[in-house]
């Protein structure tokens, strides 16, 4: 993932034809570059845009619709707590976060040649990750907790791990599992250690620790919690679009979604003489949920936040936003200080600062627990 503000310039020159007017041949893709602004490109042109740092929704499979998802009716705003309510419990849970687990999972996960969503590697890496999630569930002894693949039109499946609560009100924690080498998308080496292996291990470890809480494991939390591992993010938020479109169609009651995309690179920040921080994205997010996210960081992390912007369609939280669900996004730094190695063979585990990943794990765990037990959402 890399997001640049110049997408606005591109969007201004893009065709604003209604989606229903597009006719797609086998090698053409419909991209949404900004709300209501679309462009038809070849696959080569699509990846060229990504290599330039442009971000977009690939809405090719939604091109028969006369209405963009971004124009759908927005859901009612959610009111979040203005302070943490479960500090003692969460602080005790935080002690169980194990930094070694990040590396134990990330090492083999980044050893797949790539995790390209259209490839056999993408399929196998998703199956491998599903196995790891199932191991955590089995070891926890929690009843009713599941992990299921969410199938798409491409080989890689998204994964949804669900911890049922007393209601269908749902809290979503997300990260994307695919990786890409933009010099050779289908065949190039793409370890994807930071982008977004770091986000995957962040929410996976939070999932493990959350299940050690007796009330959570017994299904006694007021709200349901889901952990999403999205496929096809690099191709235009493909997996998360499919999921949140379905959730919208089924009137799923998602009260909050937090995305973790790149949580491990700090050298850009420290080399610039800035304090290590958690980046809080402020565009294309829910303002109230973002304020609550800062409350969580203040309470449960030991480093500060820094506000930043990432542009349109920069990660999977944008899919939640598009379908009317409140979403927030925590990032490894301010935009511009993030890893320069992503989308290449150099995005390796050696570039990941696991102490920083641990900070994101703390905020993920706090966010999940506080909202799981928020009975006024």
From Swiss-Prot:
Induction: Expressed at higher level at alkaline conditions. May be under the control of pacC, the transcription factor that regulates pH-conditional gene expression. Expression is very low under normal condition, salt condition and heat-stress condition. Optimum pH is 8.5. SUPFAM superfamilies: Zn-dependent exopeptidases. Glycans are attached at residues 87, 288. Its main location: secreted. It is an enzyme of class 3 (hydrolase). Transmembrane segments: none annotated. One of its GO terms (molecular function) is metalloexopeptidase activity. Calcium, magnesium and manganese cations reduce peptidase activity to 20.3-51.3 percent. The metal ion chelating reagent EDTA almost completely inhibits activity. The protease inhibitor bacitracin and the aminopeptidase B inhibitor bestatin, as well as DTT and beta-mercaptoethanol act also as lap A inhibitorsD. GO terms for biological process: proteolysis. Its EC number is 3.4.11.-. Optimum temperature is 60 degrees Celsius. Its cofactor is Zn(2+). This is Leucine aminopeptidase A. Extracellular aminopeptidase that allows assimilation of proteinaceous substrates. Binds 2 Zn(2+) ions per subunit. Belongs to the peptidase M28 family. M28E subfamily. Keywords: Aminopeptidase, Disulfide bond, Glycoprotein, Hydrolase, Metal-binding, Protease, Secreted, Signal, Zinc, Zymogen. It is found in: Secreted. Monomer. Zn(2+) 1 binds at residues 176, 195, 261. Disulfide bonds join 310-314. It comes from the Eukaryota. It comes from Aspergillus oryzae (strain ATCC 42149 / RIB 40).
